[in-house]
Structures are given as structure tokens and as C-alpha cells.
Amino acid sequence: MKKKIISTFACVFILAGWQTAQAQSKPLEKVRLTVPAKALTFVPYYFGKAQGIFAKEGIDLEIIVMRPPLGVTALLAGDLEYTAAGGLSFRAALKGAPLRTITFIQTRLSFSLVGQPGMTPARIHNVAVSGIGSLAHYAAITVMKRLGNEKVTYISTNTTANSYTALLAKSVDAAIVTPPYTSMAILAGYPDFGNTFDVRDLQGGLVARLQYLHERREQARAMIRATLRSMESIVKNEVEAVAYLQRGFALEPKIAADTYRILKQIVNTDGDIEEPVLKTILEKLKQESGVTAEVPLDRLVDLSLLREVKAEVGKK
């Protein structure tokens, strides 16, 4: 009798082990996400992929670098599942495109104004920005206004990397940059004239087609869950995050550590955004786009999935 009981328990454990192995061997679902550049704004996706956070949610995340207009076009065509190009997606949705932002990974602008050694705010005559009319341009105007010097010329360089290069080449008096260029410049002795970490705007999110959200609701929940867990892990695990910045973005230890200090201030671990802030951003975009008609927020965002996930994991 005793041998039969032992044999029965052995069978149960073998069956349980087989079921676990089967669950673990279930193939991951390929999910494609476009980002405008391999930039630190989108580090939650890169870090989460490297740390296996997305894989734990059953997602084989493929991150594709693609210019925002192409990324949004591919998304609308159904050629991929998500884009992180929040700003352009918002503008497209504003004009009627069936896109919805479902999570915000950054709602504080990560720009800093860095000047030439020995430069003072009053002596700044020109500032390098990645593009006229861009968030970088808006951030530069904001900082210069705070410094009391609005009589400056803004020079478009196409990319933040080019703005940083222009600063090093002494082609400009100052440049508006984001991490890691902020830390690279400041640690090299360039003066920091201020930042926009307190300015609320859209600088990264998770966007999907409306039809996809209706058809693949559970998959979208898994994507949101992984994104939130990745952001939380970045903030709570400094050693791992700094090590990843060195490895994944080829940053020197001191630059990685200082970059992490900035990231910790701007990563939106909640994934959400306050309605008044969202309305202010919407009004700004309407003015820029020449839209005068009333636009409901639910034409641009669908945060119901995010809030379901947060309730599920006990986030408040």
C-alpha cells in the first residue's frame, strides 16, 4: 500500500513538472515596436527586453528604429503592433487617425541647456536644437525665457547628437540636449544653464491601432504590464540599470551613473497622466496643427487598459 502511495505522488510530481515545462516552452509572441531612435527616452523597452521582463509576459519584443512618419504609417497599415512615437501619433489621432496612446513612459521633458565654458546666459546669442518646432525647440525657448534672454537665434541640427557635436565644435553658444549628452557635456566642464524636468509634455509612450486594441486586448494588457514593470525595475534597481546603460548604450561608468540620476527623475513609472495636463497638451497641439474643432480626449488616448493592469497588480 505504501509503495502505491509513493508511486501515486511520484506520478503527480512528474505530471506537474511536465505541465510547467510545457508552459515554459510555449513560444513567445513576436511583437514589433518602432522607436524614432535608440534613445534613452525609450530605455524602458530596451531594458525590459534585455532583462527578460517582456518575455515573462509572453512577448518576444522586436524594437525597430524608424523615423516617426514611417513608423506611424506602418502602424496604420497593420505592418507592426506598436509605436513609441507619442508626439506624432498624437497629432495623427488629432486629425482622425484611428490610433490611441495606451501608456505614457515619459511626461516630463528631459532637456537641459548646456553652454560653452565661460559662457553666461546674457551672452548666449544662438542655441542648437534638433529641429525648429520640435520639443527640443520648445524646451530651449522655455529655459532661455527663465534665464531672461529671449533674443536668441535657434539653429536646427536635425538630431540631438548633432546639437552636441555643434557644442563641442564651438559652432554655437549653447545646445539643448538630452541624456546621455547632458552628462557627457556637464562632466566635461560645460555649464548647465537649466532643464525642463518640471515641464509636462509627451516625450514617449505606447501607441496602437484602435482595431488592434479591440481584437488583442489581453496582448495589449501584457505589453502594458511589462512596460510598467520595466520602468519600476529601472527606478528600484540602480546597480542593474546603470550596468545596463554601460552595456546597452556603451556609456562610461561615470556618464552612466549621472545619466541614471536624470532618468530616475523623468521616467513615468505610473504610466498615467493627469487629465488637466493632458488637456493642456491637447490645446497646445490643436493650436500648432490649426485645429479649431472640439476634440474629445478619448479620440487620442485609451487608458482603460492601463488602469485595469494597475488595479490588477495593486498599483495606485
Residue ranges and their predicted role:
Residues 47-48, 111-120, 203-218, 266:
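A bilobed periplasmic-binding-protein/Venus flytrap-type ligand-binding module shared by bacterial periplasmic
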Residues 1-9:
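Bacterial N-terminal signal peptides that target proteins for export
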Residues 8-17:
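Bacterial N-terminal signal peptides
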Residues 286-316:
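Conserved C-terminal helix/tail region of periplasmic/extracytoplasmic solute-binding proteins
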Residues 23-166, 173-179, 192-200:
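Short, glycine-/small- and polar/acidic-enriched structural segments
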Residues 215-293:
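Secondary-structure end/capping motifs
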Residues 80-85, 262-278, 308-315:
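Short amphipathic alpha-helical segments at helix boundaries and their inter-helical linkers
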Residues 87-88, 161-249:
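Pocket-lining segment of extracytoplasmic ligand-binding domains
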